[in-house]
């Protein structure tokens, strides 16, 4: 009985609320038309009352409908050529005119990225935030990515323009990485270095693209594009933000797309460059690495970096810091935070910030196609470089290396190592290469950071 009374009272309150709401809307509409009518009133003319026809209401309704249509996205996509305000690196502001159809096309690209991330499972952790950032920044009228108050612009300015987000990502990667396989077999580091051939080889290719009409890359642009060959998203973003901020969106999307496509791109190259006999090579089990070695290793890497390549210290410093906290074991709370909460939060903001750079006036250029092409070439060269160098080492080594693990020298951790293991198991179901492949894989992370530091030192 009590519940019925309670429901009855609630029903009455709901009806009263709806009635008040309807009255407010009615009063607002009447007031709106009254205001328009007052603004549009003119001095009355003396006319024959029989021929008089009041068209004021029809005119006002037409103007109202036109006004409503003019603030819709449909109108903006079809008819508007909006000015976009953007802040330059020197603090000045530039204005670009962007047609509505270009924004609409970029939104479609954002939807394609959502499909690749959500349905095809291609790097969803970053592709999905990038996709939503792409859609939001190209939303007409809203000004979501415009300087100085658009919220995507604020995210970009706070974490990507000053390079802090990629460095925090590297801390998280360090906290997740086990350098044990590399410590157990140090010569595998050479394969990680060889895989960086794709970076420097594609640097020449990026410069050669200047021969194509409509494409102009500076040396800094070419360096930022070629780093895609390392298959390391945070490093690509870090280098692009320093050397080619205007190309950041295209470079980031290319880097993460090719990282996601590792299982599709690498196997044909691996089969092409190796024989069945080479793919069947069995490697000895790695020795057990002590806790002390794992603790000392990141400190040694950091000191060597400071002594010989200080320009790479921001990336390697963040990586070794995260790894040291993981291995030392006395600050598990900090290590877990880096691995989980901090890494996840920054990944969201990094993706949205990169998506902000996917605005129509930046992405819809011939340069974007050139970046995708050179990025693919760089990735192929990096994969091939690691495989061929492993075969070269086998000429002089008594303990043979399975060349399949050479392809893991690119920085796509741990996807590249898993692909090496998968191809090996296809040839011999008892030949597990995963732990062997992790050696060059984590070495590739260090190698790409060193390559980035060298480029920044010379051209930054």
List where the protein language model places each region:
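Hydrophobic transmembrane alpha-helices of secondary-active transporters
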Residues: 113, 136, 162-183, 322-325, ...
């Amino acid at each position: 009985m009590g519940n019925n009374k309670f429901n009855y009272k609630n029903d009455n309150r709901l009806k009263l609320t709806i009635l008040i709401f309807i009255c407010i809307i009615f009063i607002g509409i009447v007031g709106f038309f009254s205001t328009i009518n007052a603004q549009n009133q003119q001095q009355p003319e003396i006319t024959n009352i029989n021929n008089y026809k009041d068209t004021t209401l029809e005119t006002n309704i037409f103007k109202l409908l036109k006004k409503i249509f003019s603030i819709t996205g449909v109108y903006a996509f079809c008819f508007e050529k909006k000015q976009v305000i953007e802040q330059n690196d020197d603090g000045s502001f530039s204005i670009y005119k962007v047609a509505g159809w270009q924004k609409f096309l970029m939104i479609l690209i954002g939807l394609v990225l959502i499909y690749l991330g959500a349905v095809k499972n291609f790097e969803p952790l970053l592709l999905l935030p990038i996709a939503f950032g792409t859609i939001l920044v190209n939303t007409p009228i809203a000004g979501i990515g415009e300087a100085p108050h658009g919220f995507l612009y604020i995210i970009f300015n706070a974490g990507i323009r000053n390079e802090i987000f990629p460095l925090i990502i590297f801390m998280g990667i360090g906290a997740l990485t086990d350098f044990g396989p590399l410590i157990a077999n140090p010569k595998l580091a050479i394969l990680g270095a060889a895989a960086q051939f794709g970076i420097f080889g594609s640097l020449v290719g990026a410069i050669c693209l200047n021969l194509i009409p409509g494409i102009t890359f500076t040396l800094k642009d070419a360096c930022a594009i070629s780093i895609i060959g390392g298959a390391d998203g945070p490093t690509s973003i870090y280098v692009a933000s320093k050397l080619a901020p205007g190309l950041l969106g295209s470079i980031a999307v290319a880097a993460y797309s090719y990282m996601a496509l590792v299982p599709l791109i690498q196997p044909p190259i691996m089969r092409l460059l190796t024989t069945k006999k080479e793919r069947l090579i069995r490697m000895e089990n790695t020795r057990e690495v002590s806790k002390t070695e794992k603790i000392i290793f990141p400190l040694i890497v950091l000191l060597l970096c400071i002594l010989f390549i200080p320009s790479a210290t921001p990336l390697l410093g963040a990586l070794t810091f995260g790894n040291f906290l993981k291995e030392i074991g006395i600050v598990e709370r900090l290590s877990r935070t880096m691995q989980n909460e901090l890494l996840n939060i920054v990944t969201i903001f990094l993706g949205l910030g990169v998506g902000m750079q996917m605005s129509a006036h930046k992405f819809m250029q011939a340069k974007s196609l050139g970046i995708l092409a050179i990025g693919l070439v760089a990735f192929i060269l990096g994969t091939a470089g690691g495989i061929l160098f492993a075969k070269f080492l086998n000429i002089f080594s008594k303990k043979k290396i399975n060349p399949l693990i050479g392809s893991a020298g690119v920085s796509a951790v741990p996807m590249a190592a898993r692909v090496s293991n998968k191809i090996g198991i296809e040839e011999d179901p008892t030949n597990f290469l995963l732990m062997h492949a992790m050696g060059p894989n984590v070495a590739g992370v260090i190698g790409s950071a060193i390559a980035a530091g060298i480029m920044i030192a010379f051209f930054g």
